[in-house]
């Protein structure tokens, strides 16, 4: 039996205080063709992080890949098809390899980078109309989306692809994440009247995990941690008005809180090096980014560095990089199109 305790944060009654101890710094990023679009940011450790997305070219979108080496960002164009239209998406670390999902010409594939820096590709067994999400761990990878027949859950075991059935009533998988080859989780839209449902893969089948999500809610993302702790974040809607919720599994029960984030989109939520949850939020200052820190019932904010003549500063994704937090996104300077930005909290100035 799964228990659920609901707790409303006292921060909801007052505007959270600014995190005065936080100091974000700007990091130079080599320019992309304008305007760029950011997909993902993931870090293996303090000396390796990858940011993906696409940039605009005359013939459409081109894949965009940047690497952080602990000191600086650099552009990586060594992967096959770097000059071919397409887009790079989610980054996963599988053993010593880096796996990146890519779409081009309507087809999907996994790009694999070895520890020595060589690239190879694993094509999907079929093209999909939509590629919703991707997850990979040692011994397994999943791509979820849709084709003309409906929902597709494609599973790769390291040598071949198979199509996995979803439970009855599941219409669409909106996201997927995995801790191991026999411990994967997904959130789905269903026709059962339950709305969003969390599913679990145990190595044999997908089934309803019976997670007691708030009524009339969706899921933005799930964080799986090696300790077994899980965090789900999403929005709950009452009379058309949304508010952000957090659910945490501590090994015994689900605990639900409602930090005073309004209806912030929290898909970029990460566990920071300080143990708190962090996410970029919409800033009330056009010339600075803004980040929220949730530590239990305590909610604080911090701002990025001031950017001269900026009219829109949008960090899109976050990653924990050793003892630092790293963000990647876009900044629009008055009179020009958006270009890339990166900011760091902690580390060398």
Residue ranges, per PLM feature:
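Secretory targeting and sorting signals
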Residues: 1-16
């Amino acid at each position: 039996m799964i228990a659920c305790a609901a707790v409303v944060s006292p921060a909801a009654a007052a505007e959270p205080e600014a995190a005065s101890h936080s100091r974000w710094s700007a990091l130079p990023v080599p320019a992309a063709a304008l305007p760029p679009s950011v997909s993902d940011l993931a870090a293996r450790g303090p000396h390796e992080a990858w940011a993906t997305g696409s940039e605009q070219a005359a013939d459409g979108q081109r894949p965009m890949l940047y690497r952080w080496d602990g000191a600086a960002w650099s552009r990586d164009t060594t992967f096959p098809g770097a000059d071919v239209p397409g887009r790079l998406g989610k980054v996963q670390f599988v053993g010593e390899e880096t796996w990146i999902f890519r779409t081009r010409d309507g087809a999907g594939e996994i790009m694999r980078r070895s520890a020595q820096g060589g690239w190879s590709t694993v094509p999907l067994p079929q093209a999909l109309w939509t590629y919703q999400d991707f997850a990979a761990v040692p011994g397994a990878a999943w791509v979820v989306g849709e084709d003309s027949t409906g929902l597709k859950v494609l599973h790769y075991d390291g040598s071949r692809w198979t199509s996995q059935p979803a439970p009855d009533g599941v219409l669409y998988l909106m996201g997927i994440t995995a801790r191991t080859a026999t411990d994967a989780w997904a959130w789905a839209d269903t026709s059962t009247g339950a709305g969003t449902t969390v599913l679990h893969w145990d190595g044999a089948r997908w089934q309803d995990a019976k997670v007691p999500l708030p009524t009339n809610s969706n899921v933005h993302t799930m964080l799986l941690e090696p300790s077994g702790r899980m965090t789900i974040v999403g929005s709950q809607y009452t009379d058309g008005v949304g508010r952000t919720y957090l659910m945490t599994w501590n090994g015994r029960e689900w605990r639900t809180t409602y930090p005073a984030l309004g209806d912030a989109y929290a898909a970029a939520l990460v566990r920071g090096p300080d143990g708190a949850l962090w996410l970029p939020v919409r800033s009330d200052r056009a010339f600075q980014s803004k980040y929220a820190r949730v530590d239990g019932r305590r909610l604080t904010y911090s701002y990025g560095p001031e950017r001269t003549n900026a009219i829109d500063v949008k960090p899109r994704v976050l990653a924990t990089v050793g003892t630092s937090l790293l963000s990647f996104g876009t900044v629009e300077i008055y009179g020009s199109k958006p270009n890339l930005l990166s900011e760091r909290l902690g580390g060398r100035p």
